[in-house]
């Protein structure tokens, strides 16, 4: 199956050094790279994560097979979805758009987001990636 993962799930996978079964294909918008880098930086600056651990998590994510996409069709779709949903920006909409265009489900740990988009796309918990 093809799953779109957001930064919350990427960091969850990295924290656990999880082994995603080969039959699962992971996808994300290209902005995922910047989001996980910013997340690690914030955690280190706040003293909640050691720099060495942040580097280990980033290295894990760099090695994880995630197909990163960011073409104009995705951007156009994200714009339309953000507008339709009344969102203030297109960041989350890129994940939603990618799910509608290329994946079977969106994976998130955010229950509020899952409820909000659950009528538009299939949403699954991160544990589904490990099965």
Predicted feature residues:
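Short, well-structured N-terminal submotif of metal-dependent ribonuclease cores
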Residues: 1-33, 43-55, 130
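Short active-site oxyanion
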Residues: 1-2, 23-26, 66, 100-105
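Active-site neighborhoods of divalent-metal-dependent phosphate/nucleic-acid chemistry enzymes
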Residues: 67-112
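Short hydrophobic interaction/assembly module
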Residues: 47-71, 75
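Short, flexible helix/strand-to-coil boundary loops that buttress conserved ligand/catalytic motifs
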Residues: 14-15, 40, 117-118
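Acidic, PIN/NYN-like endoribonuclease modules and their adjacent C-terminal/linker elements
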Residues: 29, 33, 96-131
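Phosphate- and divalent-cation-binding pockets in alpha/beta enzyme and binding domains
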Residues: 12-13, 35, 77, 115-116
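A general alpha-helix detector
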Residues: 35-40, 57-60, 77-78
